[in-house]
Curated annotation (Swiss-Prot):
It is found in: Endoplasmic reticulum lumen. This is ER degradation-enhancing alpha-mannosidase-like protein 3. Pfam families: Glyco_hydro_47, PA. Glycans are attached at residues 104, 181, 497, 797.
Length: 913
């Protein structure tokens, strides 16, 4: 259920945006005692994560929290470009240095610095990301040096310190400099720490493209290194890269693209937004002005910010557009990295849109527990992963600092509760593989310790709780601390670019200092709440749609020339009507057609209105069909000893039987193998499966028949395991089990489908432990799930915590039983099946650093070996474009740009904040 969409129009193109309901509620203030309790809770969570890294992973780069071991590059299966952050230099330890001081753990900080000095080697024969190494390692060393000299000067320790971290930072800076050896001055995306660039042994240097954020997020760290050491070459190179990006902006829109050729300066990806691929470029322009005092950085930022608010911002949404056609949106989904932007707007002083976007993001979090990697404009999951990103916590902290509104303390409390409830595991905190099912990924990125706990601790801290004045520092994109005093220390010899022309802007909108908060808030404590109120139901959309121009047309008695429900792509008369309304059809390579409207191509303004109404009807019809035909994935959670809910398998749903989404308790019981294993005839071991969940093998009969047979024998649920040996949700679309063409109302038990790899997890557990109990549910339940015998209780003190950890499986057992789970199917603009549309499309895999599995769920009905598969209409333009050639098609420019949509996340990890 939800609010129907209402329309928004810009000349030349039309699209739909979401309506917002005016309904809100108040909140209670957080007391000082509660803040202290929450602050202590953050410290305990940090100790849990950091302690497990040091105990189980150090000196490895990162902790694998599910298997309780370190992630060492080359010893684990490659995850693609995400592994380029790992350089065998104890990444997590370096990234955490200044966090230790912020959290007042100075003794642990001294120990960590000594370990970095004695143990870390930066001269490894390994190819790393220039961007990630800069923000995480160079930034971590500089942040550690900054707080080390502060502690030494204040007499709070570190008296032995003699700039060792700075010397290491300088060594690393020189190792990164060869990356800038391009005709443009933009850095190569990767470099070999030992051999540099373009040597045979370097194994890198052939790349031609980089993301805007990758090239434009160097100035803070490199300038700080120059100011600390007096060596100007670092700041000069970073400044040259920024100058080049500024010069290559699209002059009419003042926007930059996502990906650029490092040799020619041509834009490879011409879409623009504030999320993945661009985000920290904007951030570093403004922060470079704050740190270095160079007015040109502020002028550039203001020019870009004006373009962002003019074209990209559609409060509370931030939608990507095309740099050469900024009135045309590039996609209908948003990525999670844009969550940093409200915090940047606070630094800019533009509070209202920051509050609006932050509230929208919070509503998404309240629905899914975490912010999915990407979500659509109607707030459905687009990519379901959540690698414990800190951007939303960052913006929450800055909004609280700007407004003092206790509401943001409640938001922070929600983040703490969700992390403990859904991400905490015995060996740290695990990334969420799928926010819908709660399944985990064996991953705890270094930025989780570098940023998340820093922002949460500061959110609940009073000034007296900190051992230094945090206002004397600026945060890098990785939340490392650089002192503002650097603006007067060893200024770079780089000359200011005096030839650059800046766009004339309204001075009233871009004061040289942040706007006066008294003017913004007018002493009104309800200011922020009044902005949030209209957005309270932005996700839970249960309000009526406001009358619109289209409603007036439909109520005027005028008969529309064509209704969406009547449209047939093979009807030439219908196609002629669409052409008159400015609606064109694009035939996709998988046999489907996609509708696009250009209002300026309509025969008249009335025809354009008819076309807009038709497009709205088609979107609503498509959405209705998706809801009817597609079910979200379900979860099979092993809850018996020694698993206790920590192994979650993503399962395909059935279109019949118990609806697990309406039965929150799910179905829990021991599992037993049915005989015959196919489940296609009367069950011969009825006593063995009575009151249990029956395991069956796919094939030989319809799914509904299997369900009826085990239900008749007394089973309380059923799991069908794929008979295709080696199949996995990693490599195959997730099935929906359909009925047999007859009424399935007689089936009342829940039925789920597992691929062979996931099913073998349960079968192996039965062989090992005999009695295996599972929970069938719509999503994974809390990891502190109590077993029937009550072995496991919530952790309330250290002794209970230790007792609990003793009950969990050993790392070896976890390693054997760990699996990878399926991703979310994208949702996008309406597409209608043509008369010759195939029943399904090919699966196209993506690199592992992105939400890699953009498969479409298919409905399975028939028997093995080749089951009949019913495929609902595809609903993702992005997945469609994945199947197209990589070359730009000589078609409408919008189609040429659409093919790039799915590539946006290929740079996701490279612009991590």
């Amino acid at each position: 259920m939800g609010c129907p969409a209402v329309e928004a129009r810009r000349w030349g193109d039309m699209w739909l945006v979401v309506a917002f309901c005016l309904l809100g509620h108040g909140h209670a203030a957080v007391t000082k005692e509660e803040k202290a309790h929450l602050r202590s809770q953050v410290l305990e969570m940090f100790d849990h994560a950091y302690g497990n890294y040091m105990q189980h992973a150090y000196p490895a780069d990162e902790l694998m929290p599910l298997t309780c071991r370190g992630r060492i590059r080359g010893q684990e299966p490659s995850r693609g470009d995400v592994d380029d952050a790992l350089g065998k230099f104890s990444l997590t330890l370096i990234d955490t240095l200044d966090t230790l001081v912020v959290l007042n753990k100075t003794k642990e900080f001294e120990d960590a610095v000594r370990k970095v000095i004695t143990d870390v080697n930066l001269d490894n024969d390994i190819v790393v990301s220039v961007f990630e190494t800069n923000i995480r390692v160079l930034g971590g060393l500089l942040g550690g040096h900054s707080v080390a000299i502060m502690l030494k000067e204040n007499g709070d320790g570190m008296q032995w310190y003699n700039d060792e971290l700075l010397h290491m930072a300088k060594e690393l800076g020189y190792k990164l400099l060869p990356a800038f050896n391009t005709t443009s001055g933009l850095p190569y995306p990767r470099i070999n720490l030992k051999f540099g660039i373009r040597r045979p042994e370097a194994r890198t240097g052939t790349e031609t493209d980089t993301c805007t954020a990758c090239a434009g997020t160097m100035i803070l760290e490199f300038a700080a290194l120059s100011r600390f050491t007096g060596i100007s070459v670092f700041e000069e190179h970073a400044r040259k890269a920024l100058d080049f990006l500024w010069d290559k902006r699209q002059r009419s829109s003042n926007l930059v693209g996502v990906t650029i050729n490092i040799h020619t300066g041509d834009w490879v990806r011409k879409d623009s937004g504030v999320g993945a691929g661009i985000d920290s470029y904007y951030e570093y322009l403004l922060k470079a002005y704050v740190l270095l005092g160079d007015d040109s950085y502020l002028e550039r930022f203001n020019t870009h910010y004006d373009a962002i608010m003019r074209y990209i911002s559609q409060p509370p949404l931030l939608l990507d557009v095309h740099i050469h056609k900024p009135m045309l949106t590039a996609r209908t989904w948003m990525d999670s990295l844009l969550a940093f932007f409200p915090g940047l707007q606070v630094l800019k002083g533009d509070i209202r849109p920051a509050i609006e976007t932050h509230e929208m993001l919070y509503q998404v979090i309240k629905k899914h527990n975490f912010l999915p990697e990407a979500f659509t404009t109607d707030f459905r999951v687009h990519w379901a992963q959540h690698p414990l990103r800190p951007e939303f916590a960052e913006s929450t902290y800055f909004l609280y600092k700007a407004t003092g509104d206790p509401y943001y303390l409640e938001v922070g409390k929600t983040l703490i509760d969700n992390l403990n409830k859904y991400a905490r595991v015995p060996c740290g905190f695990a990334a969420v593989k799928d926010v819908r099912t709660g399944s985990h990924e064996d991953r705890m990125d270094s930025f989780f310790l570098a940023e998340m706990f820093k922002y949460l601790y500061l959110l609940f801290s009073e000034r007296e709780d900190l051992i230094f004045d945090i206002e004397d520092y600026i945060f890098t994109t990785e939340a490392h601390l650089l002192p503002l005093s650097l603006s007067t220390a060893n200024p770079s010899s780089t000359k200011k670019n005096t030839t650059t022309q800046y766009t004339e802007l309204d001075d009233s909108n871009f004061d040289w200092s942040c706007p006066n908060t008294q003017i913004l808030f007018r002493n009104d404590p309800m200011y922020a709440q009044n902005i949030r109120e209209p957005l309270k139901n932005v996700v839970d959309k249960n309000c009526p749609r406001s009358p619109s121009r289209l409603d007036e047309i439909s109520g005027s008695g005028k008969m529309p020339p064509l209704r969406a429900r009547d449209f047939m792509a093979s009807n030439s008369e219908h196609l002629e009507i669409l052409k008159k309304m400015g609606v064109s059809l694009i035939h996709l390579k998988d046999g489907r057609v996609q509708l696009v409207q250009h209002a300026n191509q309509a025969a008249s303004s009335i025809d354009a209105e008819d076309g807009l109404r038709f497009m709205q009807e088609m979107i609503e019809l498509s959405s209705q069909q998706q809801k009817e035909q597609q079910l979200p994935p379900r979860a099979v959670q092993i809850v018996s000893h020694p698993f206790y809910g920590r192994v979650v398998l993503t399962a395909g749903p059935a279109q019949f039987g118990m609806d697990l989404s309406k039965h929150l308790a799910g179905a829990q019981g021991l599992v037993a193998r049915a005989e015959p294993y196919s489940g296609c005839s009367d069950i011969t071991n009825g006593q063995a499966i009575q009151g249990k969940i029956a395991l069956m093998q796919r094939g030989q009969c319809m799914f509904a028949e299997k369900a009826r047979n085990v239900q008749k024998a007394g089973a309380i649920g059923g799991i069908v395991i794929d008979d295709n040996e080696g199949s996995s949700s990693d490599t195959a679309p997730l099935f929906q089990m359909a009925g047999d063409g007859k009424s399935t109302d007689d089936v009342t038990i829940p039925m789920l489908f597992l691929f062979s790899k996931e099913g073998n997890i349960i079968l192996d557990a039965i062989r090992e432990y005999q009695q295996v109990e599972v929970l069938l549910s719509d999503k994974a339940k809390d990891r502190d799930l109590e077993s029937e015998s009550g072995e496991q209780k919530p952790v309330e003190n250290d002794s209970q915590k230790q007792a609990l950890e003793d009950l969990f499986m050993t790392p070896e057992e976890i390693a054997e039983l760990l699996i990878v789970h399926e991703e979310e199917s994208p949702v996008s603009q309406p597409e209608v099946p043509s008369s010759d549309s195939p029943s399904g499309g090919d699966r196209t895999s993506e690199r592992d650093i992105t939400p890699e599995s953009q498969e479409h769920k298919t409905e399975e009905t028939e028997h093995s070996p080749k089951d009949n598969v019913q495929t609902p209409p595809e609903n993702s333009e992005d997945s469609t474009e994945e199947k197209m050639d990589n070359k730009v098609q000589p078609m409408e420019s919008i189609l040429a740009d659409w093919k790039e949509d799915i590539e946006a996340f290929e740079m996701m990890e490279k612009d991590e904040l």
